[in-house]
Amino acid sequence: MAHVNHYDVIVIGSGPGGEGAAMGLTKAGLNVAIVEKESSVGGGCTHWGTIPSKALRHAVSRIIEFNSNPLFCRNNTSLHATFSDILGHAKTVIDKQTRLRQGFYDRNDCTLLFGTARFIDTHSIAVMQNDGTEETYSADKFVIATGSRPYRPSDVDFLHERIYDSDSILSLKHDPRHIIIYGAGVIGCEYASIFRGLGVKTDLINTRDRLLEFLDNEVSDALSYHFWNSGVVIRNDETYEKIEGTEDGVIIHLQSGKKMRADCLLYANGRTGNTDKLSLDVVGLESDSRGQLKVNRNYQTAVEHIYAVGDVIGYPSLASAAYDQGRFVAQAITKGQAENYLIEDIPTGIYTIPEISSVGKTEQELTAAKVPYEVGRSSFKHLARAQIAGKDVGSLKILFHRETKEILGIHCFGERAAEIIHIGQAIMEQKGQANTIEYFVNTTFNYPTMAEAYRVAALNGLNRLF
């Protein structure tokens, strides 16, 4: 008789990657358990990352909209809110998402195991529960989907009450008047938008020479300008020498000799995979210096019955991609190999204020590859829908091949950019001659809409040809 604690597959981690894998496996008829170290499902994406930061950003953008609209803001009075005030909105969304995801497991008869997992042999794990008790479970196969956490350098005192990372910032109790954000990646830039939108004096320290250098240069420059225009102080090419917590704030000493002081500091420079507590050495696996695992096209690690997906395998480290990887690994386990793979051009959504989204090549990449491309642009300020909504900051840029008219890249900066991008992405994904900028000229768009930006940009680009 089969052991009661034995499963076909055990998934470790209930974030997007783990959820995608568990749902795919249970729907294929396998007996699946999923281990979650926290008290509720969803992983870092739901509780500390994507969901709360975007909920905070939405609340702040609505406050900005209210204060900039003369219909609402009269007699020179403005609506003010603190970080603590808007955290309530984020927690409401987190609770809704958690209940929704809990329902997925309940309806699909997927066993939930709460506790911290570690391997004890190649086919068994021990799960340490909150009360200190440990239970052993075995499986034919495992999927590691433990995600990542903020990188914490050893010389920074994260126990100090004024020094935070992107997880602990959600437990911010006081209301700072001045914040230093160290690290100007996606997370750092998003939180810079949030805090500056709340009227908090914000210093953004960038270890690179430009913001989000993987973006198209024009988009990166646009973000830098809007940060500057809103009062964010950006310091590029800087590295900390020492971060010193004081009684009522933080002082950061930079290697360039500069010193800065603020009420608190958010350290947002890098992430590391959650593999250190898995006892990987027991099964013959080893993570790299970033805590990440290497996998093949079927998401198998060096141990063929142990798979890994999501942040724990590195690029692209996106919630959307992690869920797809989870679905693909379910195919690999049930059918011998994955039937689908991540698309080549994965869209990027960055929830700054204004929003940013890109898919495909940048101008600098096309120039370096000597591709004969042309540019089509549409400014939001010229769109009727943007004027009506008072959201006239931003633009859409389409990069296309001069000869074939093939769309090579799309870059959007402004309100709803992450939604707008998918219209162009759908055309880019078409095969052969179906991927053409002329589609947008020959298609009727609703009017007025933000989607009309595609028609305007297409006409603008085609008019440049000769």
Swiss-Prot record:
Alphabetical UniProt keywords: Cytoplasm, FAD, Flavoprotein, NAD, NADP, Oxidoreductase
Main subcellular location of this protein, as a coarse class: cytoplasm
Catalytic class of the enzyme: oxidoreductase
Subcellular location: Cytoplasm
Keyword Transport: no
GO cellular component, one term: cytosol
GO biological process per UniProt: 2-oxoglutarate metabolic process; NADP metabolic process
Molecular-function GO terms, alphabetical: dihydrolipoyl dehydrogenase (NADH) activity; flavin adenine dinucleotide binding; NAD(P)+ transhydrogenase (Si-specific) activity
Details of cofactor binding: Binds 1 FAD per subunit.
Cofactor section: FAD
Catalytic activity of the protein: NAD(+) + NADPH = NADH + NADP(+)
Residues binding FAD, per UniProt: 36-45
EC number: 1.6.1.1
Record-linked InterPro entries: Class-I_Pyr_Nuc-Dis_Oxidored, FAD/NAD-bd_sf, FAD/NAD-binding_dom, FAD/NAD-linked_Rdtase_dimer_sf, Pyr_nuc-diS_OxRdtase, Pyr_nucl-diS_OxRdtase_dimer, STH_gammaproteobact
Primary role: Conversion of NADPH, generated by peripheral catabolic pathways, to NADH, which can enter the respiratory chain for energy generation.
Protein family per UniProt: Belongs to the class-I pyridine nucleotide-disulfide oxidoreductase family.
Protein's name according to its UniProt entry: Soluble pyridine nucleotide transhydrogenase
